[in-house]
Amino acid sequence: KKFLFIHIPRTAGRFFTENIKLNNFESETKFIWKSIDGIEPAHFHKELYEKHFNVADIPHITIVRNPIDRFISTSIFLTRMYGDDIQDMVEDPIMLSMMLDNFPLTEGANWFRPQMDFISSKTKIWKLEWGFGKDFEEWISDILDMKFTMKDVPYKKLSTDETNKLMRSGRLIENIRQLYVKDFEVLYPEC
């Protein structure tokens, strides 16, 4: 059975990808580190996966995450590229926008892309905050019409220091809300 897992960065994608393999599925993105149209295929947004993958007639699934938590998690790449002392800069909406628009690693552009840019009308959505227990197994098993079992797999760390994140300040959270308006409206209206 084929399906498309839309891997939105910083939403437990590596964990879920390992579980895909443990359930004897093969990933469409074997060339994960090769850039196509300036983006890693593993992190293709809707426009690119529809262009490069034959996915029109298969189920699409994704995992989303609270945009504030996702941004703070992704901020390890901002501190890596711009330095440790950038808290004041990211609290300025114009500076933050410039930093994201001019992010020096083009393949990483999708790390900060709104989650709604990855989602089509066909996409089945699971929220990271709901966990990966029996409810998740039932949800994905129903979509695939076959049993899917989650296993506890070790977290695959990046080569990046994942502890060097930005602080959650009121100003930064307001900037995040402005960056991801549609994510909040559609995916997280309760936040």
Residue positions per predicted region:
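Membrane-interface amphipathic segments in extracytoplasmic regions
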Residues: 1-191
